Amino acid sequence: MKQLIIATLLSALSGGCMASSLRLPSAAELSGQWVLSGAEQHCDIRLNTDVLDGTTWKLAGDTACLQKLLPEAPVGWRPTPDGLTLTQADGSAVAFFSRNRDRYEHKLVDGSVRTLKKKA
């Protein structure tokens, strides 16, 4: 029993250390021109550093194009330690994109994947 308690504590502590080691990128690091892609559709978007609210920045892009790729067209964005969230005006999430090397990916309910990649 003692070994189980020690193992549980070590697991909890190491998990906490790993989570706290993720760095939150700044808006300036992520701002700029990006491409949102689906299987056959691509939309150019711009992640701006203009503040929409306290923790969300403005996103600019073709609304009609974005609505074809996501459940609704986002108007804002915010960085997270493990990804990037596109948001509505009130800050609620439209889609969370998890970081995958040099791009960010979001899986829709139907299983299709959307990719965000920063233009060079």
From Swiss-Prot:
Disulfide bonds join C43-C65. It comes from the Bacteria. Residues 1-19 form the signal peptide. Its main location: periplasm. GO terms for molecular function: metalloendopeptidase inhibitor activity. It is found in: Periplasm. GO terms for cellular component: periplasmic space. Inhibitor of the extracellular proteases A, B, and C of E.chrysanthemi and the S.marcescens 50 kDa extracellular protease. It forms a non-covalent bond with the proteases and may prevent autocatalytic cleavage of the proteases zymogen in the periplasm. This is Proteinase inhibitor. It comes from Dickeya chrysanthemi (Pectobacterium chrysanthemi).
